[in-house]
Amino acid sequence: MDTHIVLVYCLCDDLLKWQHHRNDSQCMLSDAEIMTIAIVAAMYFHGNQAMARLFLSEQGYIKHTISRSRFCRRLAKVRHQFLTLFNLLGEMAKAQNADNIYILDSLPIAVCDTYRIRRCQLYRDEAYRSYQASKRRYFYGLKIHLVVTKTGTPVEFFLSPGALSDTAALDPFDFDLPPEAWIVGDKA
């Protein structure tokens, strides 16, 4: 775990240096540390960023702590760097995938429960309401379509409205995969 945390920080820090990204002179945590907290939360704390912040602070990985609201604002400012990091890691995974076999699957991202749909401010269209057969429930939100290698390493993703089927969502999406690549998916 220790080496993974240090590796994540080094990747984030090198990416920001490569992009000539500058931190504010008054900030107590660098943007690389903000990105590291978010990634460590996803890797080890099931997305719980408060627990990851507390853990990294107690273990001495980060020197200063900031409030939850300040952390969320800072995290929103580096969202484009996360996409760049994901794309770079995806390109590396594609280069190492000698089999050229990829798996495509989708999973729902529920914005709210069914009884709160009328009050939802993010999405107001019926295209976002769909049925999730595996859990036997309706959801309201988006679907994330992931392209992964045989080992499960994500290389690409795209979002679509929840009611859009997987096959219909593939039409406008242009894969950035090698020409001889095989894409395997289910019929859902």
Kindly give the residue locations of the regions a language model identified.
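Short alpha-helical elements
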Residues: 1-188
